[in-house]
Swiss-Prot record:
Gene3D superfamilies: Erythroid Transcription Factor GATA-1, subunit A, Retinoid X Receptor. PANTHER family: KNIRPS-RELATED PROTEIN-RELATED. GO terms for molecular function: hormone binding; nuclear estrogen receptor activity; sequence-specific DNA binding; steroid binding; zinc ion binding. Residues 1-181 are annotated as: Modulating. Abundant in the liver and testes, less abundant in the ovary and barely detectable in the muscle. Keywords: DNA-binding, Lipid-binding, Metal-binding, Nucleus, Receptor, Steroid-binding, Transcription, Transcription regulation, Zinc, Zinc-finger. Coiled coil: none annotated. It is found in: Nucleus. This is Estrogen receptor beta. A zinc finger (NR C4-type) spans 182-202, 218-242. It comes from Micropogonias undulatus (Atlantic croaker). SMART domains: HOLI, ZnF_C4.
Amino acid sequence: MASSPGLDPHPLPMLQLQEVGSSKVSERPRSPGLLPAVYSPPLGMDSHTVCIPSPYTDSSHEYNHSHGPLTFYSPSVLSYSRPPITNSPSSLCPSLSPSAFWPSHNHPTMPSLTLHCPESIVYNEPSPHAPWLESKAHSINASSSSIIGCNKSLVKRSEEGVEDMNSSLCSSAVGKADMHFCAVCHDYASGYHYGVWSCEGCKAFFKRSIQGHNDYICPATNQCTIDKNRRKSCQACRLRKCYEVGMMKCGVRRERCSYRGARHRRGGLQPRDPTGRGLVRVGLGSRAQRHLHLEAPLTPLAPILQAKHVHLSAMSPEEFISRIMDAEPPEIYLMEDLKKPFTEASMMMSLTNLADKELVFMISWAKKIPGFVELSLADQINLLKCCWLEILMLGLMWRSVDHPGKLIFSPDFKLNREEGQCVEGIMEIFDMLLAGTSRFRELKLQREEYVCLKAMILLNSNLCTSSPQTAEELESRNKLLRLLDSVIDALVWAISKMGLTTQQQTLRLGHLTMLLSHIRHVSNKGMDHLSTMKRKNVVLVYDLLLEMLDANTSSGGSQPSSSPSSETYSDQHQYPQPPSHLHPGSEQTTADHAIVPPLGPTDDPILDGHLDAMPLQSSPPFQSLVVPHMDTNDYIHPEQWSLGTGDAAPSVEPTDYITTERVVMETALVTQP
């Protein structure tokens, strides 16, 4: 390559680039606001050429200048953005044509030249790294008609000529695949904090809440919207949502996993899997560390779930009990100013508000039970809806074990038996709760046994209600059975550690499991009573509690039936009363009692005859007088059902256990105005 005149004949090889259609560079005027001259030729060189030292060219290629200089110089090509000059002559700013990118066809044999072009530099923007560290090789071939560019953001200009070229930014911004959003407020997450992806604000809020006092009170209905703009409006709902999405105190990450760390590790320090995707090691609150794909779909997570299932199967009973004990929710406070003496409305409102708070923590507790989240979503929902009141009552009994004669609903809400007299129909439920608590006190129930019974109630609540129909349902049912076996093994292990004989261990296991049927019976009573209070508008039920209550009442087992119960006919047959005993003022009273059936067992011996005379298989459900009563456990006085029927009287057919005279009397009762 020939050197320029006046220079050493053996300097570094130079590449001559000549401007197209322009005058001498020294004659160009500078417009105000423009950058200074991009490149000034050194002294002794022709001003028509621009020389580039050889380190910017491929040293392995020998360029022959006999074909003429390469017309490649242009501020736009070198990614220098400048504003258009409208008042300058057109000769000063020539339009960029395709000929500026490759030579004419007069040189078909020109060899290819490889240039190392760095990424385009945008002025007034900080460069994340030196451009020469990530240089890319681009080939310029004279025989091809492809457009040459230094990066993908370089756009071809049209042949008619456009004043300036738009160049996109080439900064190393984070891609969409690396973005995570806060599970609480849906803002951009800064990392994996307390078991979930969360932003710095929600992380700091949750940290303050678990370290200090979290006695937040929602001014509305505990259903405030928590998003990026309204996350500071209600601290109570924000903390509730933190627990709902799975934030937990033990879920501290073992290694920082933020965008910056993931991006830096992607450069070579980050481990990679065989598919080429980067892996990030995240601590999930357990001793075993797991690998999570940042960009992988859901299907590659199957080995992780399989390993998790194996880990559950190999878990010892001691470790299983430790896990479910750690999952126990904290103490929940009512945080209300209790005004005594209670009224029916105030006590029911306090009970429902506390139950609504406990339901939120119950869902989080269930998800922390090992293996529960592996069940199908339908099974998880059904299990919770079938046993929510049983779990609440078991927790109430456990808190009340050390307080004879009292029910400890929360540390700031304790009731004696006599205080329940203000609520109609709740005294029997209180007595049953106190009886169960007394039985736990006699057995000296241990905390390990309590958590096992609580998990057993959850997993056994909906086991025999339906049969699996699909392969997914069958698989979920098998997982549920294996999980229930783990709970039973844990309970047996907990009893064996008490130093009892084999016979005593067997008896204790039987006594504890028999109490579960008592808890379910109390739960059914409480469900009926709460439904009654809701129908009478004594208390307003809303939010999660309303959904749980509707799920139980709509199942057909807890709705009171309008048909007369078996005790009605038995009482009438044993104690006949003339219709004249009804006085005009008793209509309203009896109607009210029809809405709230008096609770209490009956000693009527005719009930056995009714069950024998009307088997379930021989009568349709709508004609049976026993099945609705057995479903609802309602006890209706014989004088009440006829006045509460309203428009139509129930149809009564003569049977072998009801005399004709009694049917005539009942007809008179119904038709009496």
